[in-house]
Amino acid sequence: MGLPQLWLWLKRLVIFLQVALEVAVGKVLMTLFPGRVKQSILAMGQKTGMARNPRFAPDNWVPTFFSIQYFWFVLKVRWQRLEDRAEFGGLAPNCTVVCLSGQKCNIWDFIQGSRPLVLNFGSCTUPSFLLKFDQFKRLVDDFASTADFLIIYIEEAHATDGWAFKNNVDIRQHRSLQERVRAARLLLARSPQCPVVVDTMQNQSSQLYAALPERLYVIQEGRICYKGKAGPWNYNPEEVRAVLEKLCTPPRHVPQL
C-alpha cells in the first residue's frame, strides 16, 4: 500500500469516527429531547422542501435520522467526497456512462462545441430531486436553443433496503446495471426532455463528481464553470438558471462614436 492510499484510509478512519460520534450524539438527543430534535430536523427539511413535500408526512422520514441505515449512508457520502475530482475551473471528468439502450458512452460525448452542458445527478428515491424536477424541466425548455442537458442516474439515495423513507418510491439498491437502467426509465414518465443515462455499477461518475445523493454541474468546452453544492440541502436548479443566463447571453454591442 502506497503512501497516498494509506493517507486515504486514514482520512476514511477519521470520517468514520466523526460520523459515528454524530450519530451517537444525535440518537441520545433524540431520546432525551425528541420534540426539539424533531423541530431541528424539520427546520433543515424546509431548506430542501422536504418539510413542504405533500408526499411525505414528518413521521415518514424524521424518525429515520440517526438509525444504522442513516449512519451507513452518511458515511458513504462523506467517503465519496474524498474521491471528488471535479474542481471549479478544471477539466470535467470524462466518465463512462450508459445509455438506457445499454450503449456505453462518455460524458464529453454530450458536449456540443461551446454550448454549456448541464449535468443533473440524482435518483428517483431522492425526494428533493423529484420535488424540483419540474424546475429542472423549465431550465431545459427555457435554454434548449443555447445549452444542453444530461441527467445521470446514480445509486439510490433512499432505497427500500437502505436508508428508506415511508411512502417513498419503492426501489431497492441496484444489484446490476439492468436494475439501474430499469430505475432510470421511471424518469421517462416525467418527460425529462433531455437524455437520461446511468452511472456504471462502479459508481465512477458519482464518485469523481461527488454527486451522491444529488448535484448539479455546468460544463463549457470541457471545463467546470459551475459546481453546485451537494444535495439535498443545497440542490438548487435556480442557481443553474443564473449561470446559464450569464453564459448564454451574447455580449451587448457598444456602438463606436
UniProtKB/Swiss-Prot annotation:
Q: Where in the cell is it found?
A: Cell membrane; Endoplasmic reticulum membrane; Basolateral cell membrane
Q: What is its EC number?
A: 1.21.99.3, 1.21.99.4
Q: Major location, coarse class?
A: membrane
List residues in topological domain: Cytoplasmic.
Answer: 34-257
Which Gene Ontology BP terms does the record give?
hormone biosynthetic process; thyroid hormone catabolic process
Q: Which GO terms describe its molecular function?
A: selenium binding; thyroxine 5'-deiodinase activity; thyroxine 5-deiodinase activity
Q: Which residues lie on this side of the membrane: Extracellular?
A: 1-12
Its membrane topology: Single-pass type III membrane protein
Q: Which InterPro entries match?
A: Iodothyronine_deiodinase, Iodothyronine_deiodinase_AS, Iodothyronine_deiodinase_I/III, Thioredoxin-like_sf
* Reaction it catalyzes: 3,3',5-triiodo-L-thyronine + iodide + A + H(+) = L-thyroxine + AH2; 3,3',5'-triiodo-L-thyronine + iodide + A + H(+) = L-thyroxine + AH2; 3,3'-diiodo-L-thyronine + iodide + A + H(+) = 3,3',5'-triiodo-L-thyronine + AH2; 3,3'-diiodo-L-thyronine + iodide + A + H(+) = 3,3',5-triiodo-L-thyronine + AH2
Has UniProt tagged this entry with the keyword Lipid biosynthesis?
A: no
- Which residue windows are transmembrane per the record? 13-33
Pfam families with a match to the protein in the record: T4_deiodinase
A Gene Ontology term for the protein's cellular component: basolateral plasma membrane
What PROSITE patterns does its record include? T4_DEIODINASE (PS01205)
Question: What are the catalytic residues?
Answer: U126
What are the UniProt keywords, alphabetically?
Cell membrane, Endoplasmic reticulum, Membrane, Oxidoreductase, Selenocysteine, Thyroid hormones biosynthesis, Transmembrane, Transmembrane helix
Subunit comment: Predominantly monomer. Can form homodimers but homodimerization is not essential for enzyme activity.
This molecule's function is given as: Plays a crucial role in the metabolism of thyroid hormones (TH) and has specific roles in TH activation and inactivation by deiodination. Catalyzes the deiodination of L-thyroxine (T4) to 3,5,3'-triiodothyronine (T3) and 3,3',5'-triiodothyronine (rT3) to 3,3'-diiodothyronine (3,3'-T2) via outer-ring deiodination (ORD). Catalyzes the deiodination of T4 to rT3, 3,5-diiodothyronine (3,5-T2) to 3-monoiodothyronine (3-T1), T3 to 3,3'-T2 and 3,3'-T2 to 3-T1 via inner-ring deiodination (IRD). Catalyzes the deiodiantion of 3',5'-diiodothyronine (3',5'-T2) to 3'-monoiodothyronine (3'-T1) via ORD.
Q: Which family does it belong to?
A: Belongs to the iodothyronine deiodinase family.
Give the protein name, as stated in the record: Type I iodothyronine deiodinase
- Species of origin reads Mus musculus
Q: Which gene encodes it?
A: Dio1
